[in-house]
Each structure stands twice: as C-alpha cells, then as structure tokens.
C-alpha cells in the first residue's frame, strides 16, 4: 500500500529540498570563490564584512578567510626598504594591506581593520590609510622568512619613507606575531 503526501506537504518538501540545494550551492560558491582553502598551516585569519571566505566560524557565527603562506604569497607582492624603528634599515617583502582587503572583497562601508597578534595585542588601521599608503603585512625581511623568534611569520610594516605616515602610526603600532585581521565598520 503506497502512501502519497498531500499536495500541501508535497509542495513543502519540494520547497525544502530546493532551499537546501540552493544553500549548498551558495556555500560551495563562497568557498570556491576564494580560489582555494589552506593546505598548509594557517598563518592569518581575516574576519568581518567581506564577500570571499573559505571557512565558517561557528563560534563567531560568520564566515572567515584563512590563509596559509602559499595563499598569502598569491596576493600581489610588494617590497620596500624602510627604517624599522626597532631593527634599523630593512627591506621587507609581503602584501599591501589594501591589496589583501581587495582580494577578499571587503565591504565598501568598512572603515577600519584591527590587527590581532598572537599575544592578544591589537592595533587599529584605518582602511582609507591602507588605501593611501603601502602599509604591508610582511613575511620576509632582507629576503629571509621572518621567523617566529623574530616576530613572524607576519608583521605589520609602515612606509615611514613617506612623509606623514610615522605621525599617523608611530613606532608602537608596528605589530609582530600577526595572526588575524578583523574588518569593522
């Protein structure tokens, strides 16, 4: 004896299945849109209002974008020499903060990022300043990987060779042991 669903229940099941398929497609498209997910150790996690993400953070109730070092190096590279207030003249290589924010398609109304370090220190950078100046998330110093014992693998470098940058972001804003970036309105 076969039981048939009533017309209303049948429509409900169809709508639920369609919604499930649509949701799965959207989640899959979001992960695909970043191009990849980390295969190595995660060195940077970006959270906040953005389009591209590759992981759902259940605790935060939001998507995030995790980067391993290879993924970070896929973002356009920048290099410049600057007088590091703590280490003297260095040539740093990394990614411009503005390029990284474009890469993950940060919401156009976001106004700042909070750089989060492994020791829980936090530093605020205005997005308009990141767009105007080549503020860098560096992974190499003088062509060598920045090791954990030297503040790595990531640190924030400010282009002090440009007039006015040091007045905006003094020496205490140079962040070592960077592990996260939180985008905020």
Regions found by a protein language model. Give the residues of each.
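Short, Lys/Arg-enriched N-terminal segments with co-localized hydrophobic residues
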Residues: 2-12
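Ubiquitous "structural anchor" signal
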Residues: 4-6, 28, 33, 102
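Bacterial N-terminal signal peptides that target proteins for export
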Residues: 11-19
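Bacterial N-terminal signal peptides
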Residues: 20-28
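N-terminal intrinsically disordered, low-complexity segments enriched in P/E/S/T
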Residues: 33-185
